[in-house]
């Protein structure tokens, strides 16, 4: 069963900039501390990454996974689903962007199921840490480029 986490933050940058940074998957290793590799395998008709391969640090290990992105709710949000992963059975999520003048409210929802035998508390903590760290890193990247 997947554990879920949701969090939101306010970023001192316009929504268009936040969205552009969040969609530039191949640059994730430059600003997302846990992401070591992000490689776009397929693009949609608009040039956006539709299937992306990642290697990241998680749970004290190097994990590999492939996500498929859905842009049906753009420009307000985009979502993803796990296609393949070595330590995860599920990793489905969504970023939602709400413009508030020169600032943006960003919501991140994640459902993750780890394929390792871990106590429930650790699994829930892992989901929360992923969401929290991702939003902190995204905020820093967006505010640094404004």
List PLM regions with ranges.
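Hydrophobic ligand-binding cavity/cleft-lining segments
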Residues: 1-47, 133
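Hydrophobic residues on conserved beta-strands that form the core of alpha/beta folds
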Residues: 6, 106-107
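Hydrophobic-ligand binding "helix-grip"
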Residues: 29-33, 40-44, 55-105, 111-113, ...
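Alpha-helix boundary/capping detector
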Residues: 35, 44-48, 78, 95, ...
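Short, well-structured hydrophobic secondary-structure segments
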Residues: 50-52
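A conserved amphipathic terminal alpha-helix motif
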Residues: 111-146
């Amino acid at each position: 069963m997947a554990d879920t986490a949701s969090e939101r933050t306010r970023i001192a940058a316009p929504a268009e900039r936040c969205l552009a940074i969040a969609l530039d998957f191949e640059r994730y290793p430059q600003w997302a501390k846990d992401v070591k590799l992000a490689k776009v395998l397929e693009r949609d008709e608009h040039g956006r990454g539709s299937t992306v391969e990642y290697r990241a640090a998680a749970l004290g290990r190097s994990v590999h996974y492939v996500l498929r992105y859905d842009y049906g709710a753009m420009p307000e949000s985009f979502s993803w689903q796990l296609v393949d992963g070595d330590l995860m059975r599920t990793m489905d999520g969504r970023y939602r962007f709400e413009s508030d003048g020169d600032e943006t409210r960003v919501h991140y929802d994640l459902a993750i199921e780890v394929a390792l035998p871990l106590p429930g508390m650790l699994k829930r903590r892992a989901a929360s840490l992923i969401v929290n760290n991702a939003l902190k890193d995204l905020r820093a990247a967006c505010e640094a480029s404004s």
